[in-house]
């Protein structure tokens, strides 16, 4: 029991240090949309759970290696352990429960990012090798810059004129493939910008030799 308590305390310490370290690293870019807030909350929870699981595995492994290693001159056989039914059930059910919880939370997060607001600005987003085009049917305007109002939801209708592209603005967090094939393959995403700034639309699907240059300004 003494070793279990010590290892448990070490797990908590390592978990705390990992979480604090991850918060300082700032793995994610600026949060610039309502949808980003929802997604970042899920990311934050996932990072905390991953930090705990990492600490749980590494601490027990290293503690066993250094504390229970064979002593010099000890030639006796180690205790033979064939199995532990309770432990096997626990390490099967715990990951299963974790996956199910994150599946539910992920579904809720997805539903929140797709929640429709009245009078959303409609924008047709067309990808082609290797550029983006943005059409505003309500105003009969076409632009190579994505103009979006602050604190107003926009619904983006994504399509492609040639191969599969993927619309991604890291600061908005949302990402969705733009597919060729006509209206039946149009995909929709909703974005509500919250911070005034200059961002970049990036293609997140390998689409040809100039894929890396497929950028468009967002204002």
Where are these regions (language model features)?
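Alpha-helical transmembrane segments of integral membrane proteins, especially early/N-terminal helices
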Residues: 3-25, 52-59
């Amino acid at each position: 029991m003494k070793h279990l308590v010590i290892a448990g305390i070490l797990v908590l310490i390592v978990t705390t240090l990992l979480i604090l370290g991850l918060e300082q690293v700032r793995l994610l870019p600026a949060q610039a949309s309502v949808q980003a807030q929802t997604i970042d909350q899920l990311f934050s929870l996932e990072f905390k759970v991953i930090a705990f699981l990492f600490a749980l595995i590494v601490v027990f492994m290293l503690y066993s290696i250094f504390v229970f290693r064979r002593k010099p001159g000890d030639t006796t056989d180690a205790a033979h352990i064939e199995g532990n039914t309770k432990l096997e059930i626990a390490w099967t059910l715990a990951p299963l429960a974790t996956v199910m919880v994150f599946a539910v939370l992920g579904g809720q997060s997805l539903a929140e990012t797709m929640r429709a607001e009245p009078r959303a600005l409609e924008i047709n987003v067309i990808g082609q090798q290797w550029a983006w085009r943005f059409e505003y049917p309500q105003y009969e305007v076409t632009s190579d810059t994505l103009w979006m109002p602050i604190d107003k939801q926009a619904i983006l209708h994504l399509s492609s004129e040639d191969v599969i592209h993927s619309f991604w603005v890291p600061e908005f967090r949302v990402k969705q493939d733009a597919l060729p094939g006509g209206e039946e393959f149009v995909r929709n995403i909703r974005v509500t910008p919250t911070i005034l700034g200059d961002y970049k639309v990036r293609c997140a699907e390998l689409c040809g030799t100039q894929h890396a240059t497929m950028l468009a300004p967002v204002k």
